[in-house]
Amino acid sequence: MKSYIAKASEIERKWYVVDAAGKPLGRVASQVASILRGKNKPTFTPNVDCGDFVIVINAEKVVLTGKKLDQKLMRKHSLYPGGLKETPYRVVLDKKPEFAFEEAVRRMLPNGVLGRQMLKKLNVYRGAEHNHAAQKPEVLELRY
């Protein structure tokens, strides 16, 4: 018996809505990354983008457990000497909760062209409203 290898033309993509209100950032991000990658499908193929589209709503209401809100830092470097910028997650979640969520998911996806292609299927919204009603997304209940 041969192994099944999915082709890009054979893949059927669904749309899912995930409500992140009151849920831990990392747990939601790991499940979203798994769906974007396509690991929830029996036809998963590692070298093909076979994942589904995901809409995340209420990103501003996501929580971090413990003292991570003040102790965990978002770091970026300008590549100049002394160019390290560190921002606590409390500030990041107040100003740009969409960015914090996208970064968490991006770091869980593969690096390279395939990971960037998967990340394009992620739509994160601050509030409960989204403009993808025409795609008829299904509500996805998270395992946690």
Swiss-Prot record:
GO MF terms, alphabetically ordered: mRNA binding; structural constituent of ribosome
PROSITE patterns: RIBOSOMAL_L13
One Gene Ontology term, aspect cellular component: cytosolic large ribosomal subunit
InterPro entries (alphabetical): Ribosomal_uL13, Ribosomal_uL13_bac-type, Ribosomal_uL13_CS, Ribosomal_uL13_sf
Coiled coil start-end: none
Keywords on record: Ribonucleoprotein, Ribosomal protein
Pfam families: Ribosomal_L13
GO annotation, biological process: negative regulation of translation; translation
Keyword Ion transport: no
HAMAP family reported for this sequence: Ribosomal_uL13
NCBIfam families for the chain: rplM_bact (TIGR01066)
Physiological role: This protein is one of the early assembly proteins of the 50S ribosomal subunit, although it is not seen to bind rRNA by itself. It is important during the early stages of 50S assembly.
Subunit structure, as described in the record: Part of the 50S ribosomal subunit.
Family membership noted in the UniProt record: Belongs to the universal ribosomal protein uL13 family.
Protein name listed in UniProt: Large ribosomal subunit protein uL13
Species per Swiss-Prot/TrEMBL record: Clostridium beijerinckii (strain ATCC 51743 / NCIMB 8052) (Clostridium acetobutylicum)
